[in-house]
Amino acid sequence: MVGSRTWCESEMLFVQPDAGTKEELYYRVTPKPGQTQANFNWTPHKVRFHDARPQRDSFDLNTHGFTFVEDAISPQLIERIRADDTAAVEGDYFASVAALVKRVTGADHVVCFSPYTRKENSEKGIFGQPARTVHCDHTPAAAIELTHKLCGEDAVRLLQSRFRAFSVWRPLVEPVLDWPLAVVDGRTIAPDDLHPVHWLRYEKKDTEPPFQLSFSETQKWYYLSRQRSDEVSIVKNYDSEVVPSPRSAHCAFKHPFVPKDAPPRESIDVRCLVFGGR
């Protein structure tokens, strides 16, 4: 039964360990005939995932690079999000995410952007599915570039305060039984594990590349079993302060003990630029 064990093992896709020795890495989302999709290989590795449920409230953004927070959401808003109601996502939901992040961090200003609704077996393509590759959404340079892009003339002033970039992830169907979100203790990520990869859409280089990770035995992974819609995962992608975990990384994984009648996983994640706070 999902959630009855303290850990499980499954596979995730990592960048090959020597990827950083090659030229600038790229991945074409929809390659044309004859084009190379990528100049690196994904490598599957078996990973042990520790269930965070028994110690859910002990994880901290500064120490671990992620945290789990209870935050109520109305069934009506969930249904509007599931129906791809853009106004609901960018209006009511962005406002609730900003309020949550301010409550958790004491931040002065939060900018929400890039919402992704995901569903197992979605027809929306690769970005509508649970993410299968281990990644951190922003490199440091990309996080700063995004601030200038989204905040305009206020960027210089905002960047004088503490600056963080988060991904805020919430299930839309509960509980999550299959393809849960895994997060890694940021203290166990080595610099050599991180590889910037440009995702090419329509032959246009992504100017804000994410980090993809290579596998290391020292990495320690967690997931929250049977995660509910009122349990939100906040995952750090960047931090301007010197703290034990400057970032975490995340990925979905196929749970080995999922019931055959488990509903498809549905979720929403929103990226945030966070200024000020503790």
UniProtKB/Swiss-Prot annotation:
Annotated pathway: Secondary metabolite biosynthesis; terpenoid biosynthesis
Catalysis performed (reactions): asnovolin A + 2-oxoglutarate + 2 O2 = fumigatonoid A + succinate + CO2
Enzyme class: oxidoreductase
Coiled-coil boundaries: none
A GO molecular-function annotation: oxidoreductase activity
Keywords: Oxidoreductase
Domain of life: Eukaryota
EC number: 1.14.11.-
InterPro entries documented for this protein: AsaB-like
PANTHER family referenced in this protein's UniProt entry, alphabetically: BLL6449 PROTEIN (PTHR34598), OXIDOREDUCTASE AN1597 (PTHR34598:SF3)
Task of the protein: Fe(II)/2-oxoglutarate-dependent dioxygenase; part of the gene cluster that mediates the biosynthesis of novofumigatonin, a heavily oxygenated meroterpenoid containing a unique orthoester moiety. The first step of the pathway is the synthesis of 3,5-dimethylorsellinic acid (DMOA) by the polyketide synthase nvfA via condensation of one acetyl-CoA starter unit with 3 malonyl-CoA units and 2 methylations. DMOA is then converted to farnesyl-DMOA by the farnesyltransferase nvfB.
Protein name from the UniProt record: Fe(II)/2-oxoglutarate-dependent dioxygenase nvfI
Organism: Aspergillus novofumigatus (strain IBT 16806)
